[in-house]
Curated annotation (Swiss-Prot):
GO terms for biological process: photorespiration; reductive pentose-phosphate cycle. The gene is RBCS. The keyword Ion transport does not apply. Heterohexadecamer of 8 large and 8 small subunits. Residues 1-55 form a transit peptide. It comes from the Eukaryota. The keyword Repeat does not apply. Gene3D superfamilies: Ribulose bisphosphate carboxylase, small subunit. Belongs to the RuBisCO small chain family. It is found in: Plastid, Chloroplast. Pfam families: RbcS, RuBisCO_small. This is Ribulose bisphosphate carboxylase small subunit, chloroplastic. InterPro entries: RuBisCO_ssu, RuBisCO_ssu_dom, RuBisCO_ssu_N, RuBisCO_ssu_sf. HAMAP family: RuBisCO_S_bact (MF_00859). The lineage of its organism: Eukaryota, Viridiplantae, Streptophyta, Embryophyta, Tracheophyta. It comes from Zantedeschia aethiopica.
């Protein structure tokens, strides 16, 4: 082993002067004193700001108003707006699915650990609508679901079967009093 080290050392020592100058040895970190620095004092008028819009913003109340799905902060969608959302879902190549649930949000009733029936999993209405090309087909099924279960929340989800993920979800029907 020692002889092989000596051979490799000898090979390195025979290099020409041009090759030895190509790699500069590490000399440590340079101080920042060599770089010109312009110091600017903090001026609050130059900082990015929302301007007067901050006064217009409201905070969502933490109690009394439940947050549901993607568009839950908006007023309830009209029939035309629901159709536009479903058209968007179909244009992106997602599969529309209709689901319903009695409570409509995550809850735990009988135990502290998460379970199957704790509001994270909704019941699917019929089958996913593979091959659906028109929003009126989906809205017709939403109407049937809300007539069959008038005390349940209904939602539409857009499922991407290529990536195996749910891409969009929004409420289509809330029962009276919610």
């Amino acid at each position: 082993m020692a002889s092989s080290m000596m051979v490799s050392t000898a090979a390195v020592s025979r290099t020409s002067p041009a090759q030895s100058n190509m790699v500069v040895p590490f000399a440590g970190l340079h101080s920042s004193a060599a770089f010109p620095v312009t110091r600017k004092f903090a001026d609050s008028s130059k900082l990015p700001s929302n301007g007067l819009r901050v006064r217009c913003m409201q905070v969502w109340p933490p109690e009394g108003k439940k947050k549901f799905e993607t568009l839950s902060y908006l007023p309830p969608l009209t029939r035309e707006q629901l159709g536009q959302e479903v058209d968007y879902l179909i244009r992106n190549g997602w599969i529309p699915c209709i689901e319903f649930c009695k409570v409509g949000f995550v809850y735990r009733e009988y135990h502290n650990s998460p379970g199957y029936y704790d509001g994270r999993y909704w019941t699917m209405w019929k089958l996913p609508m593979f091959g659906c090309t028109d929003s009126s087909q989906v809205l017709k099924e939403v109407d049937e679901c809300s007539k069959a279960y008038p005390d349940y929340f209904n939602r539409i989800i857009g499922f991407d079967n290529t990536r195996q993920v749910q891409c969009i979800s929004f409420l289509t029907y809330k029962p009276e009093g919610n």
